[in-house]
């Protein structure tokens, strides 16, 4: 470990708006959804860049005036913009043919049914997101890696030699120019470590990071819920990768295996799966330990609620989420708890104590 880590107080609570944007009030415009979030006690919002009902990515990448207007709206409700997200566009950087139809709807209509044009559009979206993030004064950005190797995550039938390496080589080739654009704009690109993506655990992140030559803008969005569902130790993950974790989704989950199903879920709907996402506080994630570790390692980003639950309503989840995150944020100490007993010795005294003076 290099030097001494300085503890930081995590910012929050904030909320990811993707699951809440709707055609009905108060979720259909930026001012109304901002007021709603502020009234619930949130201090920040994370904005999905693909939903023109609340945000125009093209304008944000071309107009500082528009960005100032967005920030002004949020500030009028005592909110900050935490980050932008391109989860849907990032997914389209790499799509295996098996998922081509399923993911095609993530793109604008004019490039659908054309994988090459669709990917070019997605690349443009990511590059615009880098510029927009700079225009908005942000530090980090959330996305998905996309996937070429995911259909082969289970090694049956036996994978051809070199198949996975070829997939990751190609994935890195596609992302390197985008990472360079983020570097030019001073923004960390944070891949959410997520099932369905080639970057779905620590090892796959390392495989990708090596292929992009340890690019300093290649970082992680940490979401413990995805680790619960694959039975990965989400606390050890922080110990290993804390220097790459630049974003944090506060999302809960539970895993209750039985004699009938385990991590694969038996093709069941979310309600009947052994592993399922839950509203914050209703699952098994140890958020006290997570907030302690992240604070201790000096993470000073935002604690952003991502609500997903197959039982509880989003409105109730958002209401409870603000309070729960507030309860978990640690105001880190600036002094040692036993400073009152400091002996006041100096270097010479230390040498005498050790018998080396």
Name what the model sees in each region.
Residues 27, 31, 36, 76, ...:
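Active-site acidic/histidine proton-transfer and metal-coordination neighborhood
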Residues 47-70, 90, 145-152:
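Glycine-rich, proline-tolerant flexible connector loops at the mouths of alpha/beta enzymes
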Residues 37, 45, 74, 84, ...:
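Conserved, mostly hydrophobic/aromatic
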Residues 10-13, 28, 44, 51, ...:
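Acidic/histidine-rich catalytic cores of soluble enzymes
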Residues 21, 56-60, 111-120, 165, ...:
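The substrate-binding groove and active-site-proximal loops of carbohydrate-active enzymes
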Residues 20-21, 304-314, 342:
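A short, acidic, flexible beta-alpha connecting loop/helix-capping segment that sits on the rim
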